C-alpha cells in the first residue's frame, strides 16, 4: 500500500472512531412498573423484532413519585403507568398520551382470615397497602363508595412499595393486604415457609364488575408516551405493539421460562411469577380501541375525585 492509500485508510478509520453513531443501533428506552405486566416488556425487549434494529433498554421505576419525576424531567418518554396518570399529566400541560392497556386488573385482597371474602368483611379489620392516592387506593375507594361501605371503618395502613406491604403483612398483625401481582403470589409462597396461611380473599376486578354492573374489567395500567416522540416514531411503535402481543402469547405458553426473565426485573421469585400470569388479566390492547371502556372508567374516577385525573375528563385524542 502506498503512502497516499495508507493515509486515506487512516483517515477513514479515524472518522469511524469519532462517529460511532454510524454503526450503533438507535436507542429505544422503556420504563416498566414494579408489577407483572413488565414481564411482557422484558420478553418483547429480548425477543421482539425491534431488538434487531434498536438497542432496547428496560428499567423499572419503584414508586409513583419516581415515575412522576422521571416524566417531568424528560427522562421517561415511554413508561408503564396507572392509566389515570397519563390523563393527569396531560391535564397538567405535559404532552403525554395513553398508548395501550396491559392489564385489565391485577389487584386482589390477600388475607390470613378465611372469613374475609368481601369488601364488607374488611370493616373493623387492619388492612395494609401501598401507593396512597394511586391506583390501588383509588379502586378500593371507588368500590367502597359504590357499595356503601364506610372506608373510614377499615383501619388502613399505607406504605411506599408493594414488597414493603407484603413484608409487614406477613410479619405483623394485619388481617389483610391489598396487593398486586406478582406480590400476591409471592406472599402466598412466603407465608407457607413462615407457617402463615395466606390466601386470596377476593379479586378486585371481579368485585368492580359486580359493583358497577359491568364485566370484571379494570383498565388499570398500560404504557404512556410523550406524544411528540410517538408521532416521530409511529412505525417503530407499530412494531413494538406486535412484539408485545407476541410476548404475551409466548409468556402464557412458556410460564416457567417467562418467570426466569421476569425475575430479573421484579422483586418476586420465579415460582410466584409463574403462578401470577394467569390471574393478572394481561392484555395488549391499543388505548384508542378501548375508548368507551376507558371513558367509563375515568367517569367513575372523576366522580370519586376530579383531582385523580388532573381536574377534568380526558380528551379522546389522548388515546393513541
What label would you give each PLM region?
Residues 75, 80, 90, 131, ...:
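Sec/Tat-exported extracytoplasmic proteins
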Residues 24-150, 156-159, 175, 181, ...:
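Short, glycine-/small- and polar/acidic-enriched structural segments
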Residues 295-320:
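Conserved C-terminal helix/tail region of periplasmic/extracytoplasmic solute-binding proteins
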Residues 5-23:
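N-terminal export signals
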Residues 230-304:
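Secondary-structure end/capping motifs
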Residues 84-85, 164-261:
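Pocket-lining segment of extracytoplasmic ligand-binding domains
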Residues 49-53, 207-216, 283-291:
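Short, solvent-exposed loop/beta-turn-alpha elements that line the ligand-binding surface or hinge
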Amino acid at each position: 500500500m502506498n503512502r497516499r492509500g495508507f493515509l486515506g485508510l487512516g483517515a477513514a478509520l479515524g472518522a469511524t472512531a469519532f462517529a460511532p453513531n454510524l454503526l450503533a443501533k438507535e436507542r429505544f428506552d422503556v420504563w416498566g412498573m414494579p408489577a407483572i405486566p413488565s414481564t411482557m416488556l422484558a420478553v418483547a425487549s429480548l425477543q421482539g423484532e425491534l431488538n434487531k434494529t434498536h438497542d432496547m433498554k428496560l428499567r423499572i421505576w419503584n414508586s409513583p413519585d419516581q415515575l412522576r419525576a422521571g416524566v417531568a424531567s424528560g427522562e421517561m418518554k415511554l413508561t408503564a403507568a396507572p392509566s389515570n396518570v397519563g390523563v393527569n399529566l396531560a391535564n397538567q400541560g405535559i404532552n403525554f398520551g395513553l398508548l395501550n392497556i396491559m392489564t385489565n386488573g391485577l389487584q386482589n385482597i390477600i388475607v390470613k382470615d378465611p372469613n374475609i371474602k368481601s369488601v364488607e368483611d374488611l370493616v373493623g379489620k387492619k388492612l395494609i397497602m401501598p401507593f396512597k392516592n394511586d391506583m390501588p387506593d383509588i379502586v378500593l375507594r371507588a368500590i367502597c363508595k359504590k357499595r356503601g361501605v364506610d372506608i373510614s371503618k377499615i383501619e388502613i395502613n399505607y406504605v411506599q412499595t408493594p414488597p414493603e406491604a407484603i413484608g409487614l403483612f406477613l410479619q405483623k398483625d394485619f388481617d389483610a393486604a391489598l396487593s398486586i401481582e406478582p406480590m400476591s403470589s409471592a406472599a402466598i409462597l412466603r407465608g407457607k415457609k413462615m407457617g402463615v396461611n395466606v390466601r386470596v380473599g377476593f379479586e378486585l376486578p371481579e368485585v368492580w364488575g359486580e359493583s358497577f354492573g359491568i364485566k370484571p374489567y379494570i383498565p388499570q395500567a398500560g404504557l404512556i408516551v410523550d406524544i411528540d416522540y410517538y408521532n416521530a416514531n409511529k412505525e417503530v411503535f407499530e412494531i413494538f405493539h406486535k412484539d408485545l402481543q407476541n410476548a404475551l402469547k409466548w409468556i402464557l405458553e412458556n410460564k416457567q421460562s417467562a418467570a426466569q426473565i421476569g425475575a430479573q426485573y421484579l422483586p418476586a421469585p420465579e415460582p410466584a411469577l409463574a403462578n401470577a400470569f394467569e390471574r393478572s388479566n394481561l392484555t395488549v390492547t391499543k388505548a384508542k380501541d378501548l375508548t368507551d371502556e376507558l371513558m367509563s372508567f375515568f367517569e367513575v374516577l372523576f366522580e370519586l375525585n376530579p383531582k385523580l385525573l388532573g381536574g377534568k375528563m380526558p380528551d379522546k385524542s389522548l388515546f393513541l
